[in-house]
From Swiss-Prot:
Superkingdom of origin organism: Bacteria
Upper taxonomic lineage: Bacteria, Pseudomonadati, Pseudomonadota, Gammaproteobacteria, Oceanospirillales
Location in the cell: Secreted
Modified residues (Tryptophylquinone): 581
GO cellular component terms, A-Z: extracellular region
Chief place where the protein resides: secreted
Miscellaneous section: The intracellular stability of LodA is dependent on the presence of LodB protein.
Protein activity control: Inhibited by aminoguanidine, amiloride and beta-aminopropionitrile.
InterPro entries: LodA, LodA_C, LodA_N
Gene Ontology biological process terms from the UniProt entry: defense response to bacterium; killing of cells of another organism; negative regulation of single-species biofilm formation
Enzyme nomenclature, EC number: 1.4.3.20
Protein name as annotated: L-lysine 6-oxidase
Amino acid sequence: MALSVHPSIGVARLGNANTDNFVLNPMEIGGLPYEHDVDLKPTTTVVNFKDEAGCIRRQGQVFKVFGASNEELTLDSPNVKNIEWTVHLANKKAAWYEFRELNGNLLYGRDNSYSARGVPWRNASKTASSERQSLIIDLGPRSVSGVMATVEISINNIPETYLHPSYPSGELLQGSKHFESLGTLRTDSQGRLIVLGGYGFAGGNTDLSGYGGGDDWYDDISDGSVTCVVTYSDDSSETSTAWMVVGSPDFAPEIVNISTLSDTCFDVGVRNFDLVPDMYDSATGHYKSDYVANFDRDILPIIQRISQYQWVSNVQSMSGFFSFQFDYRDGSAANKANRMKYYNYFRQLDNKVIGDYDQPQQVLMSSEVEGDILPLMPMNSGSNSVSSSNFYDLTDNVVEKFLALDATQLFLLGQWAEGEFTAGPADDYPVSDMDTASIGNCVGLPMCPGIEMTWSLQNPVIYKDAYQIKHYQDKAYFDVNGLTPERDECEEETGCEPGDLTKRMACPWQADFFNCTIQTVNFSEPSVNKASQTETVTSRTHYEWGNLPAGVSVPDQSSVSATKNVDEKVPLPPAYYSYWWPPQSPWDVLTGELDTEGQLHSHLPAGQQINYARGINSYSQMVEHWSALAFIRDRNQNNDGFPFFTETERNHELFDFKEVLVGQVTGNSEDNETSLPVFFINANKESLEGKGTKKGKLMASYFEERAFSKVRSSNIRPRSGTRMRG
């Protein structure tokens, strides 16, 4: 009997509510998480994402094991004696290289390796092997079996057999003072595994220095191996494996990224593991032109995702891509011109080479001719719209300004345009629904670095098969040797250690989340994203001279009165206002309070478009108050085709509000007939309790009880666009 564990890559999401207050994973792409009963079985979709104190509930991932005939095996199965699950989670962020966009991505060749690019380590002052290993948060593996069992992945129960545990000990000076846990393992009433992640811990000993985070900082994001051993009634046993990733909360779970991590894994599987041999010829490395796509399975999801972006971003020019201005299902030759026009508005993929900037993903508009101008699709920033070709003292930094769909998505869209498609029901691809549902709710593109994981998932060398992460070693090896801080799984090509899939992400995650929504991107110079700026103020004196011979003139005199160097590099104009991952990190949203009390505390009417992160005005505030952000939900979800997405569960009590008259800024009283809304945090106990709500009082108690120190930031260089909020 051949076992398989699903999902093959599970995704949990951290939260700061108490240990037992959690939800279970969505069961479809764009689905809501589930409540559970006393047996830990899913019941209804989530009622509230937060507890009464405004803390976010953790989202657990359910794992199931299946036999050779694809039947689920549980402790109720007649031939099953025991099911034991072992999970080894780790966080390697502090021990990895500094974040430098696409530097280190070996899909661009060995010349783009971390060492070839001269990328420094995080916490570079720690050089000894033992010091580097100590930067990893690694509490060793935990095992759980039976029914309704619970094991915490805590500093207080590290297995004696695990010889090299490590974690930030002592009291940290900023943020969360004490690290305690990477999460929880539980089993339900039939022995299925539920993995819950951390509690939103983020702390350090230095000031935060940018969207990559800071040295000597930690968070409790993690990833690692899942191993299932099924023992049968005759005492024989079989083993199967999977992988687990703990990410940040998904604040708009029903809105799906145009290219998800499931799309990434599908693309890798098609082109490297013969996942759909009728679609791709692995011998020639080309897609098959006679492959027949299916509209409902392959094309409609892209259109639906595009239609949802309007609820979390201002992308009016995308409306033509879901307006059904022609019959998208019509595959006739007469309709081909319409389909081709649609397809040609999607930019093509760059070749992954260093130094070639004359490529499709550097192009914003469809044309330079007035009357034929439309931003190409998708309207997202690319995986490096931040740093120019000469940044980091490099001759040829990789620049990727704007997004393109992945290769397989583009191929299927092209087949639709050519008329090589059917409409209606179609056979499913050979991928488990559980596999697609887990990572299908994660960001697939762009990757700068991403939200949950990054561009290493595009590299086939980390997989043993489609959708299946290759494990580097087993429990016995890690018990003795521990984890390796400097090992690059994409370079060695021998599999992943716990912590490898999330180590390239920002540390702490909140730093990048604060700045990972908007990017203003230059679209005129393919190799340039940003440049330094010198502002020079001159004065000019004009003299009138008389009694001069014909043809003689005296030039005006000028002098420099002030020069100012702008230390921060800024986008070179002309630039375009582009989004990163609005479904995961919303920006332009609708207010949703529908009762008197809610509107009094929100200071806004319902239905007003407003900045999602209003009131979170710094990196340090994001680290401390990330759980105050709203969840975006479809308030009309029972009526398919008529969505109404608004904010819900925002912690309004945390924020104070003032209308600032424009005249206060300009000094001109005539400007005072216009005001600007300003939201800011007031977290003192008196302010929270003074709001007069139960939630405000509980929030005040929560802030008093937690162990947290003020977070500072210095030398901040935010991603362009984030500072100014409309």
